[in-house]
Swiss-Prot record:
Keyword Methyltransferase: no
UniProt GO cellular component terms: extracellular region
Protein name stated in the entry: U4-lycotoxin-Ls1b
Chief location of this protein within or outside the cell: secreted
Disulfide bond annotation, renumbered to this chain: C48-C63, C55-C72, C62-C88, C74-C86
Residues covered by region (Knottin domain): 45-88
Amino acid sequence: MKVLVLFSVLFLTLFSYSSTEAIDEFDSDAEDDMLSLMANEQVRAKACTPRLHDCSHDRHSCCRGELSKDVCYCFYPEGEDKTEVCSCQQPKSHKYIEKVVDKAKTVVG
């Protein structure tokens, strides 16, 4: 009976060791594959639309200002046909906040 317990403990120890080695090898191979894929990956950032330019093609493409991102506003100009015109603009609240921050920067130093 003692021999059976001894062999079962030995078997479990060897089994856990071998399974850990296999998992470690699998993880290292997966890490190597991921690193090689990341090395081949190219950055594909979209070009942003500058302030006061047309953003009707992509309404989420406006560039960032100093503190916040500009917003694409769409409107219908007066006296023209019913075509919608969109442009990237800075919200008034953000404009005021940037002015306050600029004043604070000049006061503080």
